């Protein structure tokens, strides 16, 4: 009976949508024949709610695990740029695919108004090359720049906008970590004169991030590595970007 109770608790906690009948069937698959009332008694004894209440309180970890392959996240960062009339603030938007850590530079503007965000939404959901196309969920904070029209555009493409609670950066940790990386490794180390110089730096960093930078969250692997020699025989070379701000060491082919 102890094994049955352990299994009932496990099935219910790992599968928030499973009701008594579904749990009963899973137990039968393992050779345990029990009545639905037994499952109900066990759940109550262990303080576990019935399926409807359990499903409504699905843990964040369970949600991420269930939809990991189809979740993306988006966020803005700001960068100060010098122009003809002094310093201006540019808003830079990025999107990230959680499973692969691939990042997309979605655009930048000094005025992220509704028209601009709607155009970005069209680009992100484009059925040919939209970064969010075929994603099911998109995590975002409650920034007013993610307008109702923008969220409706995502929803119309089959992507559910998941608006996170205020002051909860840990729930969007993947894109927050990317923002810290691009700031500390690139943007905070440079002074920008005009939008074009910032755009070039962002594109160079994103290329470095994908093809040259190791990622601890991926077992210290590179997301999209370039071909490397199979034997450690060639000379070690350094590829520099942005005048040496970014460096990648590799071997020449022997």
Language-model regions: role of each:
Residues 1-254:
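Charged DNA-binding/catalytic regions of mobile-element recombinases
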């Amino acid at each position: 009976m102890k094994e049955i109770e352990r299994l009932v608790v496990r099935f219910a906690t790992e599968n928030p949508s499973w009701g008594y009948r579904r749990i009963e069937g899973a137990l039968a698959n393992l050779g345990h024949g029990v009545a639905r009332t037994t499952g109900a008694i066990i759940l109550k004894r262990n303080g576990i709610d019935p399926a409807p209440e359990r499903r409504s309180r699905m843990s964040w970890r369970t949600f991420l695990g269930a939809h990991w392959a189809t979740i993306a996240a988006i966020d803005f960062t700001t960068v100060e740029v010098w122009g003809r009339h002094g310093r201006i603030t540019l808003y830079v938007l990025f999107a990230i695919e959680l499973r692969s850590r691939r990042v997309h530079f979605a655009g930048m503007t000094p005025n992220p108004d509704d028209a601009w965000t709607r155009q970005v939404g069209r680009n992100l959901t484009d059925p040919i090359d939209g970064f969010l196309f075929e994603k099911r969920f998109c995590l975002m904070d409650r920034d007013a720049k993610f307008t109702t029209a923008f969220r409706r555009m995502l929803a119309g493409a089959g992507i559910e906008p998941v608006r996170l609670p205020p002051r909860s950066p840990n729930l969007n940790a993947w894109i927050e970590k990317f923002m810290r990386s691009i700031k500390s490794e690139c943007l905070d180390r440079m002074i920008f004169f005009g939008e074009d110089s910032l755009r070039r730096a962002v594109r160079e960093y994103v290329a470095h991030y994908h093809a040259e930078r190791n990622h601890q969250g991926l077992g210290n692997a590179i997301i999209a590595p370039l071909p490397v020699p199979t034997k450690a025989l060639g000379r070690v070379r350094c590829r520099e970007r942005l005048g040496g701000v970014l460096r990648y060491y590799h071997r020449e082919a022997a």
